[in-house]
Amino acid sequence: MVLYFTGTGNSRYLARRIAEGLEMPLYDLNACIKAGDTAPVQTGRDVVLVTPTYAWRIPRVVSEWLGKTALTGAERIWFVMDCGSEIGNAAGYNRQLAAQKHLRYMGTAQIIMPENYIAMFNAPQKEQARSIVKQAEPTLQKVLAQLRAGQEFSPPRDNLYDRFMSGSVNPVFYRFFVKADAFRATDACIGCGRCVELCPLNNVHLKNGKPVWGKNCTHCMACICYCPKEAIEYGEKSKGKPRYHFEALEKQQDI
């Protein structure tokens, strides 16, 4: 089974491609996490977990969900992580997570995809994003070939910098930067509720027709990037930046 969590569609796209290539079922963790559903999941022997990279590890909401949820029948697990640049030493923590679940760790693969973290970085324009997705294709094909063969992924880079970012920086980043306080709706907001619908942690609700954010945010960027009117800002940091979500690339041409 292919499990995935996504913020703005990159991981959903990769998970869909992997599930199709392996003829395996696809399981949406966003829906489970949003519903608070931790009922056992009948996965079968092999599990592929596809996620974005948050602070140089898999998203904390995903590791927490996995800690509460039994993967019935699972024996082996592969991790596929997409990122804008690097995953640090995420593999080391994925190995620990696999051990906690009593699963054979089959490795972690990194796939570079378009950046979406506009709370800190710039997202690409559509044509640049399409180029990045096309450049990711050989890596995706290699991942698929290894999965079909039941092979372990090759070990990713692991140096002192990677260990520092995934180790010391990760908890500091969550504590001081992963907050919803800076999100706000502009006058362009039409109160459609798309942000409420997409938030995997139910952290957004409408008040007097406008979104209001709570304290339980994972910085997935779904609310700000999927807003149809681009009516959400993250303080001053997001102003003037392109909003990125994968589905916008699919509207005009096939990927």
Label every PLM stretch briefly.
Residues 1-2, 6-14, 20-32, 37, ...:
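FMN-binding flavodoxin-like domain, especially the glycine-rich phosphate-binding loop
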Residues 40-41, 70, 176, 197, ...:
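Generic structural signal for beta-strand residues in well-ordered domains
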Residues 41-42, 121-123, 220-222, 248-252:
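Short low-complexity, flexible loop/linker segments enriched in glycine and/or proline
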Residues 56, 113, 208, 234, ...:
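Generic structural "secondary-structure junction" signal
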Residues 159-192, 197:
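A mid-sequence, solvent-exposed acidic-amphipathic segment
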Residues 184-185, 190-212, 216-218, 222-239:
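Iron-sulfur cluster-binding cysteine motifs and their immediate structural context
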Residues 230-255:
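Long, positively charged, glycine-interspersed low-complexity recognition regions
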